[in-house]
């Protein structure tokens, strides 16, 4: 019987994944981010991998659903919970051995959810300078927070430039779901 590849825990509790695994899963996350961009969503894609199997995946669905909480990580968490239910598996056992691969640093909301779900390792692309929950704005990942589970490890910077370029492309385009501006522009009268 072939052993399944996956995250390995060191004696100090640190998790690690191979470069090959990281490349494989981050490529799929990047494809999901591109799909989000093609659908006028903020280009973030992620995968939750347990025992070398994708148990949850997501891309941003905020504009599509008109629900500000439908970030890629939240969509993936919902899918992983469904995966556990369908297989009669304990979510806590699965999540404690699941690695999340995501193209952009999780926001504060998503980092808090990942911590509550006890995800041990998050591999991400670029930093989220506005809302980052893994150290860019707040450090939900490793802060001493009561009743929130164990801190999780972060491996930042994987294909960061590519993730930033997708974000730039998104923010250059018009968002058809954005509310209309209520600011009145003064007309210039030339004499």
From Swiss-Prot:
Active site: residue positions: 73
Protein name as it appears in the record: tRNA-specific adenosine deaminase 2
Domain CMP/dCMP-type deaminase: 20-145
Required co-factors: Zn(2+)
GO molecular function, one term: zinc ion binding
Example of a GO biological process term: tRNA wobble adenosine to inosine editing
Keyword Translocase annotated: no
Protein role: Probably participates in deamination of adenosine-34 to inosine in many tRNAs.
HAMAP family: tRNA_aden_deaminase
Organism lineage string: Eukaryota, Metazoa, Chordata, Craniata, Vertebrata
Enzyme nomenclature, EC number: 3.5.4.33
Catalysed conversion reaction: adenosine(34) in tRNA + H2O + H(+) = inosine(34) in tRNA + NH4(+)
Chain sites annotated for binding Zn(2+): 71, 107, 110
UniProt keywords, alphabetically: Hydrolase, Metal-binding, tRNA processing, Zinc
Family: Belongs to the cytidine and deoxycytidylate deaminase family. ADAT2 subfamily.
């Amino acid at each position: 019987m072939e052993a399944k590849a996956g995250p390995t825990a060191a004696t100090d509790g640190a998790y690690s994944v191979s470069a090959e695994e990281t490349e494989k899963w981050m490529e799929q996350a990047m494809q999901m981010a591109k799909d989000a961009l093609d659908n006028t969503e903020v280009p973030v894609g992620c995968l939750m991998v347990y025992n070398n199997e994708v148990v949850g995946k997501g891309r941003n669905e905020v504009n599509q659903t008109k629900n500000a909480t439908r970030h890629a990580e939240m969509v993936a968490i919902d899918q992983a919970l469904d995966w556990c239910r369908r297989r009669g598996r304990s979510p806590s056992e699965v999540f404690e051995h699941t690695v999340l691969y995501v193209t952009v640093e999780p926001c504060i909301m998503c980092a808090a959810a990942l911590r509550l779900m006890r995800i041990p390792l998050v591999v991400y692309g670029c930093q989220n300078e506005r809302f980052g929950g893994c150290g860019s704005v707040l450090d939900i990942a490793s802060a001493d927070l009561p009743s929130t589970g164990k801190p999780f490890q972060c491996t930042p910077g994987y294909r960061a430039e590519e993730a930033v370029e997708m974000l730039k492309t998104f923010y250059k385009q018009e968002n058809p779901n954005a509310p209309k501006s209520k600011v009145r522009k003064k007309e210039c009268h030339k004499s």
